[in-house]
Amino acid sequence: VDEMDARFNGEGINGHATGLKDLDELVQGLRGSHVIIIAGRPGTGKTTLGLGIAEQLTIRESKSALVFSLEMSAKELSKRSLASSSAVTLGSIDTGQAMGNGESITRITGAVSRMHSADLRICQKGGLPLSRIRNIARFQHRAKPLDLIVIDYIGLIAPEASSRQQNRNLELGAISRGIKAMAKELDIPVIVLAQLNRSIETRSTKKPQMSDLRDSGEIEQDADIIMIAHRDADSDLGRSGVTEIDVVKHRHASVGHCLLQHQGEFARFVNYAGQREQQQEAAAPAPRKSSKSLLNDFNPRGGF
């Protein structure tokens, strides 16, 4: 009743915000026990969007999140977070060029401070079966309650030893049911990244559909929300990074779509305003550090 009253009076969304206005209006909050699928072809920004939501909760809202990065290392993800939070390009961070620019150093100093204060935990172990993922999540949740889990991505979750001879479709069905059970057990939203079938690229209509989920099995049935990231590489908008997020399933709201601006150089999405946003975060003034000192400070949180 209190929840309904708050919603009636316009007091925010029901669940965690993504930090992206149009997406929040569409999704209406990431709720406890829900499984949210973010699907797309390689290069459409699945990891960027999933990590960005985790950053929103941990860096900007002081909540706790656990990211299972089955593909990238914790250091790679942390560099992306650093670029996103500092508005210093990922390329200049990766090559070290950022350390030769005073403004970049100031921005990075502020971002490093915010990241150190954030409870963003990263598990970088690859080839984990779901049973191991659930045990790690339980342990981390007991240590300090989590508000969100992100799994990047479902296709890299290893089969259980007892089911390795099964069809992969059946394995993914069991994995999907297990992820839903974990979300309900911990009563937190779980974001799961997923690949789309390559066959999209050979169709005349390249806009993805829910049926394009690779080895979809029971993923469509178990998920509470399915959103698909799509960027039209043949259009001027697509080439400038404008990305369509198509919510093709939502148990508690209407389906629909919104546009986000992908800023690949900063490894982040921002609100789409009809033009290329030149969004630069104003970092708080900070004492200038030497390049060596800053690099020593930059250690990925977690990485267990």
What do these predicted regions represent?
Residues V1-V88, E103, T109-G110, N296, ...:
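The Walker A/P-loop phosphate-binding site
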